[in-house]
Curated annotation (Swiss-Prot):
Superkingdom of origin organism: Bacteria
Protein topology in the membrane: Multi-pass membrane protein
Statement: the UniProt record of this protein carries the keyword Repressor: no
UniProt cross-references to Pfam families, sorted A to Z: DUF423
GO CC entries: plasma membrane
Subcellular localization, as worded in the UniProt entry: Cell membrane
Protein's name in the database: UPF0382 membrane protein SSP2132
Keywords, alphabetical: Cell membrane, Membrane, Transmembrane, Transmembrane helix
Transmembrane portions of the chain: 3-23, 46-66, 69-89, 94-114
Family: Belongs to the UPF0382 family.
Length: 120
């Protein structure tokens, strides 16, 4: 599905930008702890952005419906990486409670891909 290629490319692009911003713009503004949080958000955004690209590419070539997988990965990025970016910038710790929602969305998305693959 074209939408997942677009979302994947945009997320990979944003991960490069947020990674550079973290390394150069936040270096002396955040503690090592919160820089690490920022880096984790960037890393997971990149991994799952690449996952979205893969979902977009395989969606037209397989008999399994991968649309749910794509949406779960996308919203996983929003909740997981998004909450970590906000946490790093604001240092409001309660925001970290949102992060596991994104993690669960990632896990369920990948699991659905595995299950769908076995059904082929």
């Amino acid at each position: 599905m074209k939408v997942f290629i677009i979302l994947g490319a945009l997320n990979a692009m944003m991960a490069v930008g947020t990674g550079a911003f973290g390394a150069h713009g936040l270096e002396n503004k955040l503690s090592a702890k919160y820089l690490s949080v920022w880096e984790k958000a960037t890393t997971y955004q990149m991994y799952h952005g690449l996952g979205l690209l893969a979902i977009g590419i395989i969606s037209g070539t397989t008999s399994i419906n991968v649309n749910w997988v794509g949406w779960l990965l996308f919203f996983g990025i929003v909740f997981f990486s998004g909450s970590l970016y906000i946490l790093a910038l604001t240092q409001i710790r309660i925001i970290g409670a949102i992060t596991p929602i994104g993690g669960v969305l990632f896990i369920v998305g990948w699991l659905m891909l595995v299950i769908g693959t076995f059904k082929i």
